[in-house]
């Protein structure tokens, strides 16, 4: 019989093994030469084989019996599984079997036992796991899980647990963002989903209940940018409606002006604000293709000339503006020149 302590010990050991695996991979990447690298690779293979055997034994003892139905959940064990998975997620651990499949099982259990808090937590976890996935249909699954939470918004006013209420609040954020990430809906539907979130965040009853716990105005600003800015950034002009662009211009324009107040040198602002705003102006016909490309190139040239590699303090290289130019912006410039070649003179 699997006990609460068994489950707690399982996740403690499983996390330890995941850490060990990450450390082995990290050491492999730090090899000084090919000979050392090959020796580390051989050691890694042996270690990973033993680790796999141990993990499989742990899963066979404490997880698979529940997934197969051989052992049934009860309230205590279900709550224990959920608590452990929440902690694992907060610590950055990911694993399909130990986390995703167990959470899917828990979701069904909490739904049947009418544990609304547990069910909402499970829907939130599953939405996040599938959003991070790359498999076919992962985006649709992620959106569906967050949508299920949104559809339970009336429960928000009945739930006393702040952690559960936050899952509902963040579902209104994640639902449109996931729709953008996986390009799942039309502009019209995306605006409807966005407005649904705005209505919830601006509901006086919501602000009265949790206005001291969350900054809803900041949440609205971030959501507007994440949806409008990122959708425009990843779309062709023909795929974006005028209504969407007009709203995007308002949001991106406000961010652009705010950055200019901090520093009048427009080339010093974050690249995502500068480039997305001008892309929006180009799509609206307020900036010619030639002006857009030349201004875009001037922005990139300024950064390449004034920001050597690693010069942005406190910023990881892959988040630096130089890295973004190399991997994103130069490609975007070439794409615009080719795709809109009749307009570039």
Placement of each model-derived feature along the sequence:
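N-terminal cationic leader/targeting segments used for protein routing and processing
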Residues: 6, 210, 214, 240, ...
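N-terminal leader/linker segments that initiate helical-solenoid repeat arrays
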Residues: 2-42, 71-75
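A generic structural signal for ordered secondary structure
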Residues: 78, 99-100, 105, 119, ...
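Flexible helix-coil transition and linker loops at the boundaries of alpha-helical arrays
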Residues: 63-74, 105-119, 151-165, 199-220, ...
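Eukaryotic alpha-helical solenoid repeat scaffolds
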Residues: 307-310, 315-316, 326-334, 345
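Intrinsically disordered, low-complexity regions enriched in serine, threonine, proline
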Residues: 1, 9-10, 24, 37-39, ...
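Amphipathic alpha-helical repeat scaffolds of TPR domains
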Residues: 36-46, 57, 71-88, 116-133, ...
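Helix-turn-helix repeat elements of alpha-solenoid scaffolds
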Residues: 15-22, 34, 49-63, 90-105, ...
């Amino acid at each position: 019989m699997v006990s609460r302590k068994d489950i707690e010990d399982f996740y403690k050991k499983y996390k330890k093994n995941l850490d060990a695996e990450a450390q082995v991979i990290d050491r492999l990447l730090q090899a000084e030469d090919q000979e050392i690298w090959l020796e580390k690779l051989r050691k890694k293979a042996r270690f990973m084989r033993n680790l796999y055997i141990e993990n499989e034994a742990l899963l066979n003892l404490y997880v698979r019996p529940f997934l197969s139905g051989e052992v049934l959940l009860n309230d205590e064990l279900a709550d224990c599984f959920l608590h452990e998975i929440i902690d694992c997620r907060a610590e950055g651990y990911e694993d399909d079997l130990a986390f995703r499949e167990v959470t899917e099982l828990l979701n069904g259990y909490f739904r049947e036992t009418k544990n609304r808090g547990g069910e909402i937590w499970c829907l939130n976890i599953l939405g996040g796991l599938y959003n991070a996935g790359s498999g076919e249909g992962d985006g649709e699954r992620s959106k569906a899980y967050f949508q299920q939470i949104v559809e339970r918004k009336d429960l928000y006013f009945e739930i006393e647990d702040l952690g559960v209420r936050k899952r509902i609040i963040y579902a209104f954020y994640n639902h449109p963002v996931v729709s953008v990430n996986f390009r799942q809906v039309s502009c019209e539907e995306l605006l409807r989903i966005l407005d649904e979130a705005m209505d919830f965040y601006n509901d006086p009853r919501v602000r009265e209940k949790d206005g001291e716990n969350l900054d809803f105005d900041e949440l609205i600003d971030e959501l507007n940018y994440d949806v409008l800015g990122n959708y425009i950034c990843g779309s062709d002009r023909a795929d974006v409606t005028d209504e969407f662009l007009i709203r995007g211009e308002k949001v991106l324009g406000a961010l652009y002006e705010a950055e200019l107040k901090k520093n009048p040198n427009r080339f010093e602002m974050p690249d995502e604000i500068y480039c997305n705003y001008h892309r929006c102006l180009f799509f609206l016909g307020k900036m010619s293709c030639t002006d857009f490309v030349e201004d875009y190139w001037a922005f990139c040239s300024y950064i390449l000339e004034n920001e050597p590699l690693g010069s942005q303090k406190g910023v990881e290289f892959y988040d630096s503006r130089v890295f973004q130019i190399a991997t994103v912006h130069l490609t975007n410039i070439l794409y615009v020149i080719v795709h809109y070649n009749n307009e570039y003179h």
